[in-house]
């Protein structure tokens, strides 16, 4: 099997450790930083870092390429193994004993160009700016208006990221939906809304505000169009992986009080 290993810039040592182990059984055809430019074509991409590193690596992958993450960050929702579990991973790889998750991207079109996001796209005011009036138009429906600091459009993958911190719901990764979450809205009853993923969303602000794609500032714009992309990646998990266990252990959600 031809494998690419991509690592967070500060985790080259850990990347070399995995390369040494994996190369005993498989051909490592690429070894480099996850944030380096270019596309990666391999049978499997191994990522060393946290969720941010996985997000960067996913955009370099060819459609449908399986990916597996080794945790070297904080929460690690998108990582599946620890470095200490490398032998367990190699055993799972020999037998292809994985659970697979399909994680799809959203496509964002604006005057800044076209972008892909696995988590979310955010339009928000500057720290020094005032609240903004934002119009959100969902395909086949009339507009919604928010007077807020901004708005986040997220995938199910991104529901445990920025959207969650501003009151959005946790969405299981198998769901085919998009989430629209206003940031610090003026009216208390303004809450997140979940829509079908095949609906296009147009967001327009009364003035230029910051656009962030998967947390990375890309510039200022007034208007974006968001829709589900055809691009996707496959995340490999250990066979016993359980999403509820993950959100309970990492977020404390649904934890039983003894």
UniProtKB/Swiss-Prot annotation:
Pfam families: NAD_kinase, NAD_kinase_C. It catalyses: NAD(+) + ATP = ADP + NADP(+) + H(+). Keywords: ATP-binding, Cytoplasm, Kinase, NAD, NADP, Nucleotide-binding, Transferase. NAD(+) binds at residues 51-52, 56, 119-120, 130, 149, 160-165, 184. GO terms for molecular function: ATP binding; metal ion binding; NAD binding; NAD+ kinase activity. GO terms for biological process: NAD metabolic process; NADP biosynthetic process. Belongs to the NAD kinase family. Its EC number is 2.7.1.23. One of its GO terms (cellular component) is cytoplasm. The active site is at 51 (proton acceptor). InterPro entries: ATP-NAD_kinase_N, ATP-NAD_kinase_PpnK-typ_C, NAD/diacylglycerol_kinase_sf, NADK. Involved in the regulation of the intracellular balance of NAD and NADP, and is a key enzyme in the biosynthesis of NADP. Catalyzes specifically the phosphorylation on 2'-hydroxyl of the adenosine moiety of NAD to yield NADP. The keyword Ribosomal protein does not apply. It is found in: Cytoplasm. This is NAD kinase. It comes from the Bacteria. Its cofactor is a divalent metal cation.
């Amino acid at each position: 099997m031809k494998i690419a290993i991509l690592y967070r810039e500060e985790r080259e040592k850990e990347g070399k450790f995995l390369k040494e182990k994996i190369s005993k059984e498989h051909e490592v055809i690429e070894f480099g930083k996850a944030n380096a430019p270019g596309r990666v074509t391999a049978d499997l991409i191994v990522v060393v870092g946290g969720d941010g590193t996985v997000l960067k690596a996913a955009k370099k992958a060819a459609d449908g390429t399986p990916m597996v993450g080794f945790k070297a960050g904080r929460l690690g929702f998108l990582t599946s193994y620890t470095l200490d579990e490398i032998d367990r991973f190699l055993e799972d790889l020999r037998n292809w004993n994985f659970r697979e998750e399909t994680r799809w991207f959203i496509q964002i079109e604006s005057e800044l160009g076209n972008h892909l996001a696995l988590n979310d796209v955010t339009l928000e005011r500057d720290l020094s700016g005032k609240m903004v009036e934002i119009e959100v138009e969902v395909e086949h429906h009339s507009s919604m208006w928010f007077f807020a600091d901004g708005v986040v459009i997220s995938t199910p993958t991104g529901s445990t990221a920025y959207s969650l911190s501003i009151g959005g719901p946790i969405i299981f990764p198998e769901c085919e939906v998009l989430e629209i979450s206003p940031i610090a809205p003026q009216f208390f009853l303004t809450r997140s809304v979940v829509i079908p993923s095949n609906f296009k969303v147009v967001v327009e602000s009364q003035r230029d505000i910051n656009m962030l794609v998967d947390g990375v500032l890309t510039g200022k714009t007034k208007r974006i169009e968001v829709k589900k992309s055809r691009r996707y990646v496959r995340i490999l998990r250990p066979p016993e992986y359980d999403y509820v266990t993950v959100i309970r252990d990492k977020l404390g959600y649904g934890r039983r009080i003894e």
